[in-house]
C-alpha cells in the first residue's frame, strides 16, 4: 500500500532480499544503492543522489511522502539497506555539475549542469506529448505499456495487472 504498485523481478524490492539471502557479502561491501542512471550522474558530477521517478519504480518509496520508507525496508527484511539509499531529487533538479575528471573522460565541458533526469517510461510520456489527463500514450516495446496522467494515484491495485505509479 505504501508504494502504490506491484513488484516485478528486476526491482530493488526483489533484488535486495535476494542478495541478502544469496550474496550477503555484496551488500556488506555496498556503500550506495542507486539506479544505473544515478551512477552515471554520480560519475559525471561526483554527487550521490537518487531521482524520484527511478526511485519510486523500485518499490521502496512511499509515494505519499515521495521518500524512502523505513517500514518498507523492514517488511522486506532489508533494514540494513535503508542507510545506503541516496537522497531523492526531483527529475528537474540540478544534481551537480560536470567535473574536470568527467570532462577529460567524456568531452563534456566542466561546469555543465546535470539534471536528475527521468525514468525512461516517464520521459517517453513527456516526449509523446502526454501533458494532461486528457491524453494517453502507448509504448509498443518490450512491455507494451499504456500510460496516462492522473491527479490522484490509484489506491486499489489489481493483482493481475502490473501497475506502476510514478
Roles of regions detected by a PLM:
Residues 1-166:
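Glycine-rich phosphate-binding/catalytic subdomain of phosphoryl-transfer
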Amino acid at each position: 500500500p505504501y508504494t502504490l504498485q506491484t513488484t516485478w523481478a528486476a526491482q530493488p524490492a526483489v533484488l535486495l532480499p535476494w542478495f541478502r539471502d544469496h550474496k550477503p557479502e555484496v551488500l556488506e561491501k555496498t556503500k550506495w544503492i542507486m539506479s544505473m542512471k544515478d551512477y552515471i550522474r554520480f560519475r559525471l558530477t561526483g554527487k550521490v543522489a537518487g531521482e524520484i521517478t527511478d526511485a519510486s519504480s523500485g518499490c521502496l518509496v512511499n509515494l505519499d511522502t515521495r521518500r524512502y520508507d523505513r517500514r518498507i525496508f523492514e517488511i522486506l527484511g532489508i533494514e540494513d539497506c535503508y542507510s545506503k539509499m541516496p537522497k531523492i531529487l526531483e527529475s528537474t533538479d540540478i544534481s551537480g555539475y560536470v567535473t574536470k575528471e568527467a570532462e577529460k573522460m567524456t568531452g563534456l565541458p566542466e561546469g555543465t549542469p546535470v539534471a536528475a533526469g527521468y525514468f525512461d517510461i516517464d520521459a517517453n510520456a513527456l516526449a509523446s506529448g502526454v501533458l494532461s489527463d486528457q491524453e494517453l500514450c502507448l509504448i509498443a516495446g518490450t512491455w507494451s505499456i499504456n500510460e496516462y496522467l492522473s491527479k490522484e494515484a490509484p489506491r486499489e491495485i489489481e493483482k493481475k495487472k502490473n501497475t506502476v505509479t510514478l
